[in-house]
Amino acid sequence: MKTKLNKIANDTNIFLKKFLNKQNNSKLLPAMKYGLFPGGKKIRSKILIDIGSLLAIDYKTLIAIGAAVECIHAYSLIHDDLPCMDNDKIRRGKPSTHIKFGESTAVLAGNSLLTMAFEILASSSLQISEKIKINLIKRLSECSGHLGIAGGQYLDLSYEKKKISKNKIIEMEIKKTGKLFSFCCAAPAIIKKKNTKEIKFFENIGSDIGLLFQIADDLIDFKVSSKIAGKKTGKDQKKGKATLISLLGYMNAIQYCDKIILKTNKNLKRYGSNSKNIKETLNYILHRKK
């Protein structure tokens, strides 16, 4: 699993570095690169490639789309770490972007990575039809704004120190994390020109995977040391964050994750042994330490 993730991370970073090298030089590039590289585990890109391989989508096309997704993810982390948001000083084992470059530069670098994602999807390096590009851009923009990441982060902040129902926590976590995974699962189906029902099928799988990822992330915050995780842990409890762990308890949250994995594997049964990569990724998501 590590070898597969490392290859995807390496190929994605090569694509992003080449793309950035073609950009006109600007004072924001160092902060953008700092927030983007070396980057995380590229699990979103791995899910995209797992689903893409089920539908026989070209690997280079998937890497380009994954690079756009990683720009969105990096933007969201830079902004989440800001003092006005989660106020995290460490990210991926190094000082957060705003600690290194200052708050205003971090905000602008995050904004620039957000818009660069759409540049990538619109670029000639992505060998798909203009109609499909427009569809992907529309869907990725929805995942990133008030209907997705930004809206989910707003709810996350507003739910602190409040008693929130299970359904509302799930809605928040799907917006905050699940929407981007939904895009990763739906994009290959869109490229393959699948019908609306089939695209929705993959979107729903993505929502479930995103929820699994968020619960697993909360489990790391609950139990793993900051040194191993590469970020400050134990903060959710201190801030009174609304999570499924705080509502259901540690063991019940793990059981909930197991149910998501069983459901996803059942839904992908039609692809037989071809779905073994995604099964492996789901188990990795739940059992990772950072």
Model-assigned labels for residue ranges:
Residues 4, 11, 17-268, 276-286:
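Mg2+-dependent prenyl diphosphate-binding active-site environment of isoprenoid biosynthetic enzymes
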